[in-house]
Amino acid sequence: MSVLKINQGNFESVKNSERPVLLDFYADWCGPCRMLSPVVDEIATEREDILVGKINVDEEEELAREFGVFSSPTLVVMKGGRVVSQSAGVRPKAQILAMLEG
C-alpha cells in the first residue's frame, strides 16, 4: 500500500482506521527525515495490514502540536484511535516494526 499524505482534512478518517496506523512527522528540510523516509515507504509497501501516513510539520503545525511533536522525524503508532507508541529520531526498520507490534 502507498503512503498517505495526512492533513487536517483527512486525519479523522486515518485516526479511526481499523488497522494500526504509523505516522511519520517530517520536514522537507530535515536530513534525518530524508534518511528515514525510504524505510517508512518500505514498511508501507510490505505491510498491507498497516496504514502508513506522513505529516509535513511545516504544513500541518496544528497536527504536530496535537501530538506534541517538537523534533523531526517523529514516529507515532496509533491503534483504535489512540497513541500507543511515539519516538523521535531515526529508527531502524526492526525497531519501527517492534513499535507496531507492541
Spans of features found by a protein language model:
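Conserved helix-turn-beta segment immediately C-terminal to the redox Cys motif
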Residues: 18-20, 37-55, 59-61
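Non-catalytic, surface beta->alpha helical segment in thiol-disulfide oxidoreductase systems
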Residues: 76-102
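A short beta-strand-turn-helix
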Residues: 3-20, 61
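Short pre-active-site segment immediately N-terminal to redox-active cysteine/selenocysteine motifs
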Residues: 18-19, 26-29, 71
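Conserved redox-active cysteine motifs that mediate thiol-disulfide chemistry
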Residues: 25-39
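Structural micro-motif
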Residues: 67-76
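Conserved Rossmann-like nucleotide-binding pocket used by diverse enzymes
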Residues: 2, 26, 51-53
